[in-house]
Curated annotation (Swiss-Prot):
Methylates the class 1 translation termination release factors RF1/PrfA and RF2/PrfB on the glutamine residue of the universally conserved GGQ motif. S-adenosyl-L-methionine binds at G117, T118, G119, T120, G121, D140, W168, N183. This is Release factor glutamine methyltransferase. It catalyses: L-glutaminyl-[peptide chain release factor] + S-adenosyl-L-methionine = N(5)-methyl-L-glutaminyl-[peptide chain release factor] + S-adenosyl-L-homocysteine + H(+).
C-alpha cells in the first residue's frame, strides 16, 4: 500500500477525531521514520507489510480514542520533545501560558524555582532551558512520573534541574524559592468531561481534586507561603471557570498583586500572586 493510499483510508476512519488528517500523518511519520515533507512529496512510496501491520494496530487504538501522544510516546512542549506515558498528564499547549508568565516575572539574577507535580517535567524543563542560570527543583509524588521527568531531562541534556519524589512540600522542609509554579489537579470528580477525549486515558490522580477541584490548589496556596522568599511569586494553572475562586484563595492567604492571565483560547487559566514574609 502507498503512503497516500493509507493516509486517505486512515483519515476516513478518524473522522471522530478533532484533527483526523494530522493524526493520520503523525502515525505514518512515527512508523516510517519519515518527516511530513517527505511523506507528502513521495506519496507513492510503498509501505512494507510490517509497517502496514503496525499502522493498522495504531489506527485501531486511535479510533478507540487513545491519545496520539500515548501511541507515539512523545509530545512536544515549548519546542521540547518529551517522552510521555499513561502515568502522567499529556502536556497541553495552554500550559505554555504558565511558562510564559513565569519567565516574564523571574528576576534577572539567578534564582531557585520549584515546580510542584511535575509529571513529564514539561514546565520545569521549559524553564530550565530558558533560564540555564537558575536552579530548578521539580517534584512529583508518583515514582513513575519522577522517573519519566528524569528521563526527559537526561534526553534533553538539561543539567540545571533536580527531580525528586515528594508529596507536594513533604521532602522540601526549610527550602525557599523565588518562584513556585504548578499545574495541579483541579477537576471536580463529577465533571462529565472526565468521560471524554484524552483524559479518559490519563491518571485520575493528576486530574481530580476534592472540594469541586479546589483542594490541591488551596493547599499549595497556603503551604507556598513558607517556601517563598519575601516577594516571591506563586503561579498556578486552573480550570477556565475557577479564576474567581482561585483569586479569592490567594487574597485570603495574604498574597499581593493577585491577577489572572488568559490562555490562547481567551479563557482564565493562570492565577498568580506575590507573598511577602
Amino acid at each position: 500500500m502507498e503512503y497516500q493510499h493509507w493516509l486517505r483510508e486512515a483519515i476516513s476512519q478518524l473522522q471522530a477525531s478533532e484533527s483526523p488528517r494530522r493524526d493520520a500523518e503523525i502515525l505514518l511519520e512515527h512508523v516510517t521514520g519519515k518527516g511530513r515533507t517527505f511523506i507528502l512529496a513521495f506519496g507513492e512510496t510503498q509501505l512494507t507489510d510490517e509497517q502496514c501491520q503496525q499502522l493498522d494496530a495504531l489506527l485501531t487504538r486511535r479510533r478507540d480514542g487513545e491519545p496520539i501522544a500515548h501511541l507515539t510516546g512523545v509530545r512536544e512542549f515549548w519546542s521540547l520533545p518529551l517522552f510521555v506515558s499513561p502515568a502522567t498528564l499529556i502536556p497541553r499547549p495552554d500550559t505554555e501560558c504558565l511558562v510564559e508568565q513565569a519567565l516574564a516575572r523571574l528576576p534577572e539574577q539567578p534564582c531557585r524555582i520549584l515546580d510542584l507535580g511535575t509529571g513529564t517535567g514539561a514546565i520545569a524543563l521549559a524553564l530550565a532551558r530558558e533560564r540555564p542560570d537558575c536552579e530548578i527543583t521539580a517534584v512529583d509524588r508518583m515514582p513513575d512520573a519522577v522517573a519519566l521527568a528524569q528521563r526527559n531531562a537526561q534526553h534533553l541534556a538539561i543539567k540545571n534541574i533536580h527531580i525528586l519524589q515528594s508529596d507536594w512540600f513533604s521532602e522540601l522542609a526549610g527550602q525557599q524559592f523565588a518562584m513556585i509554579v504548578s499545574n495541579p489537579p483541579y477537576i471536580d470528580e463529577q465533571d462529565p468531561h472526565l468521560q471524554q477525549g484524552d483524559v479518559r486515558f490519563e491518571p485520575l490522580t493528576a486530574l481530580v481534586a476534592a472540594d469541586s477541584g479546589m483542594a490541591d490548589i488551596v493547599h499549595i496556596i497556603e503551604q507556598s507561603r513558607n517556601a517563598l522568599v519575601s516577594g516571591g511569586f506563586l503561579l498556578l494553572e486552573h480550570g477556565w471557570q475557577q479564576g474567581e475562586a482561585v483569586r479569592q484563595a490567594f487574597i485570603l492567604a495574604g498574597y499581593h498583586d493577585v491577577e489572572t492571565c488568559r490562555d490562547y483560547g481567551d479563557n482564565e487559566r493562570v492565577t498568580l500572586g506575590r507573598y511577602y514574609q
